[in-house]
């Protein structure tokens, strides 16, 4: 009787192994688990506006970024540096010609990028402490004080005021031009309407 039961159990087990429908669901293997982990974003990644995590390809692209990819344009940094030195030289009544070597331009490019990101990090912390998502100009000025550069606050304020005045001046110059364009379009429309009215009168 025992032998019969053991034989029946063996036959049943063989039948289950040969029939895919009777096989129990296989547990995820470590390889499958690692594959699932690869699909999940690293800790700290946030969802986008659609509620999706960054794709694996996007994460890999971010991992491939180097310091050179994050640097400010060298031409702009060099131009700003030359303007600053040019103003200082003119004040001292010296030769206004300014020459920057390749190494000097590279040093300015790298240092300016690091400085701005360091300053912005402190400005963001100040904004977050006030329950704000975006940084304001005052946050940046307070950040200057936090990193020990409070002496530049007055200079930055002056530059901001100059920039705002320049923006307003350019807007004021564009507004009359836009008004003139609208006036010309209105005159053309009036002339066209008048010609249509004259044509109708002639028909009558």
From Swiss-Prot:
UniProt keyword terms in alphabetical order: DNA replication, Nucleus
Compositional bias (Acidic residues): 181-193
GO CC annotations, alphabetized: CHRAC; epsilon DNA polymerase complex; nuclear replication fork
Intracellular or extracellular location(s): Nucleus
Disulphide-bridged cysteine pairs: none
GO terms assigned for molecular function: chromatin DNA binding; DNA polymerase processivity factor activity; double-stranded DNA binding; nucleosomal DNA binding; protein heterodimerization activity; single-stranded DNA 3'-5' DNA exonuclease activity; single-stranded DNA binding
Keyword Nucleus: yes
Key word Transcription regulation present: no
InterPro entries, sorted: CBFA_NFYB_domain, DNA_Pol-Epsilon_Subunit, Histone-fold
Alphabetized Pfam families for the sequence: CBFD_NFYB_HMF
Main location: nucleus
Segments of this protein annotated with the region Disordered: 165-204
Role this protein plays: As accessory component of the DNA polymerase epsilon (DNA polymerase II) participates in chromosomal DNA replication.
Extra facts: In eukaryotes there are five DNA polymerases: alpha, beta, gamma, delta, and epsilon which are responsible for different reactions of DNA synthesis.
Quaternary state and interactors: Heterotetramer. Consists of four subunits: POL2, DPB2, DPB3 and DPB4.
Protein name, per record: DNA polymerase epsilon subunit D
Species of provenance: Eremothecium gossypii (strain ATCC 10895 / CBS 109.51 / FGSC 9923 / NRRL Y-1056) (Yeast)
């Amino acid at each position: 009787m025992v032998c019969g039961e053991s034989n029946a159990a063996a036959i049943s087990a063989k039948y289950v192994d040969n029939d895919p429908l009777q096989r129990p669901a296989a547990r995820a293997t470590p390889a499958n688990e690692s594959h699932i982990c690869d699909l999940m974003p690293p800790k700290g990644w946030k969802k986008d506006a659609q509620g999706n995590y960054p794709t694996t390809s996007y994460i890999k692209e971010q991992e491939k970024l180097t310091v050179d990819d994050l640097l400010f344009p060298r031409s702009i940094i060099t131009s700003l540096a030359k303007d600053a030195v040019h103003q200082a030289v003119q004040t001292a009544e010296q030769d206004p010609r300014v020459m920057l070597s390749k190494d000097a331009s590279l040093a300015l490019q790298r240092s300016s990028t690091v400085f701005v990101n360091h300053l912005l990090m402190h400005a963001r912390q100040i904004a977050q402490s006030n329950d704000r998502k975006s940084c304001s100009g005052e946050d940046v000025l307070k950040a200057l004080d936090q990193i020990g550069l409070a002496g530049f606050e007055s200079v930055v304020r002056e530059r901001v005021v100059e920039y705002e005045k320049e923006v307003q001046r350019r807007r004021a110059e564009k507004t009359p031009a836009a008004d003139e364009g609208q006036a010309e379009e209105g005159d053309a429309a009036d002339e066209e309407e008048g010609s249509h009215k004259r044509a109708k009168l002639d028909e009558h």
